[in-house]
Structure formats: C-alpha cells, structure tokens
Amino acid sequence: MVDIVVTGLSANSVPYIEALERQRALHADVVAGRAQDTVILLEHPSVYTAGRRTEPEDRPRDGTPVIDVDRGGRITWHGPGQLVGYPIVRLPEPLDVVAHVRRLEDALIALLADLDVASYRVDGRSGVWIRGAAPDGSPRDEKVAAIGVRVAERVTMHGFALNCSNAFDAYDRIVPCGIRDAGVTSISRAIGRTVTPADVVPLLRPHLVRALSSNGSAMPATAPLSSVAGARA
C-alpha cells in the first residue's frame, strides 16, 4: 500500500529546499524499513530546478537563481498552481526505472481522462502531453506534466510536476526540459476553466495508489502511448 501525504498547497506551499530535505529523510526511512512507500503532494513557491542533464543554454540568461538537483532531466520550473508529487517508493527487482516513470505517466493520463482531457506520451520524451498549437497556429505537442526521478538503494526520489492553474511567464526565461520544439500547457488552459492543485488531489490519489501498488507491473494507460526513453523531465 502507498501512503499519500499532502503537505502544503496554495498559501501553505513548501519551499523547495525544505521539501528536498523531507524527501531525503523519508527516503532514508523507506530504505531502512522504518516507513512505508509514500507520495508527498505539494506546491512550491516559484523556483527553477536543474537536473543532471541541464545544458548552460537552458538556464535563465539574466542570472536568476537555479537549484541544481540530483534527478534526471534538465531544467524546469515549479510554482503556484502546479501540483508536485514526490513518490518515495521501493522498486521491485529487477530494477526498472523506466517502468516506474511509465507508472507515473499512467496515473497522470488516467487523471486527465477523468477531466475529459486527452493526453498521451511522446516517443523519446518522458512526461505527459496534450495536443496544442504554436503561436503561428500549427499543431504541436504541449507538456502538461514533467517527470524526473532518481533511484538510490532501490528507492525513488523526485517525481512529477503537473500544471494545473499556473501562469506561464516563468517558462519564457528557460528552455523547459531542454525541449525547444514543443510548448507547455495546463489543465485549466486545456479545459477552459480553473482547476487548482487542491481540486486535482482527490482525483489523482486513487490513480497513484493503483499505479504504485502494482508491484512493478506497468498499468495500461487510458490514452495513446509510445515508448519512454528514460527517467528524465
């Protein structure tokens, strides 16, 4: 069984470094058998974080601070209106990090289906995507959820960031996830009404429990799928 813990939403958002310390402490407890598998759900105040694959050209050019972290992937933004999930779970043997990423994607795709949002995977790119339009009107993939994870001693850290009702100006200062030929979107933009992280939590909870309690068997997703290249944002 997976425990879902909501630690701070909206005005009670949790600073990134504080949440990272909580992750590390819980990770140590799960590794040692002192705690069960847990997903932490929260919002952060506005912050940029950079995974191990971040390139210099991905970063803000104006010197805006960026927190470098030990997850996969490249640079991304967290902030108000975005639901962040940190699954601290023990993976089965044989270790398969990509399968873990797929399970997270499955849960998010199922949640979006509950909201009548059609979402999917993109070959070679992790995360969850929605079909959108570029400024010139041409169709393009737009990321609604980013994923970046780390595994140590068979226990995961970091996780997903799901855009619910956030603004998009912070993305203009970076190359989100190092991807230049796609956009970003949110649930609220996709369905034309405001859907906050607090609205999403009760809908997402059962999908996370089901996906992460599946003992390593990737759940069938509810939307068109393609392969995931790796555990990155």
Swiss-Prot record:
Top-level EC class as recorded in UniProt: transferase
Top-level lineage group: Bacteria
Catalysed reaction equations from the record: octanoyl-[ACP] + L-lysyl-[protein] = N(6)-octanoyl-L-lysyl-[protein] + holo-[ACP] + H(+)
GO cellular component, one term: cytoplasm
CDD domains: LipB
Binding sites annotated in the UniProt record for substrate: R71, G72, G73, R74, I75, T76, W77, H78, A146, I147, G148, G159, F160, A161
EC number: 2.3.1.181
Gene Ontology BP term (one): protein modification process
Cited Gene3D superfamilies: Bira Bifunctional Protein, Domain 2 (3.30.930.10)
Keyword list, A-Z: Acyltransferase, Cytoplasm, Transferase
Active site location: C177 (acyl-thioester intermediate)
Pfam families, sorted: LplA-B_cat
GO molecular function ontology, one term from the record: lipoyl(octanoyl) transferase activity
Pathway(s) of this molecule: Protein modification; protein lipoylation via endogenous pathway; protein N(6)-(lipoyl)lysine from octanoyl-[acyl-carrier-protein]: step 1/2
Record has Acyltransferase as a keyword: yes
Domain (BPL/LPL catalytic): residue spans on this chain: 33-216
Site features described as Lowers pKa of active site Cys, chain residue numbers: K143
Subcellular location per the Swiss-Prot or TrEMBL entry: Cytoplasm
Keyword Cytoplasm attributed: yes
Misc note: In the reaction, the free carboxyl group of octanoic acid is attached via an amide linkage to the epsilon-amino group of a specific lysine residue of lipoyl domains of lipoate-dependent enzymes.
Protein role: Catalyzes the transfer of endogenously produced octanoic acid from octanoyl-acyl-carrier-protein onto the lipoyl domains of lipoate-dependent enzymes. Lipoyl-ACP can also act as a substrate although octanoyl-ACP is likely to be the physiological substrate.
Recorded family membership: Belongs to the LipB family.
Name of the protein this chain belongs to: Octanoyltransferase
Organism expressing this protein natively: Clavibacter michiganensis subsp. michiganensis (strain NCPPB 382)
Lineage of the organism: Bacteria, Bacillati, Actinomycetota, Actinomycetes, Micrococcales
Gene label: lipB
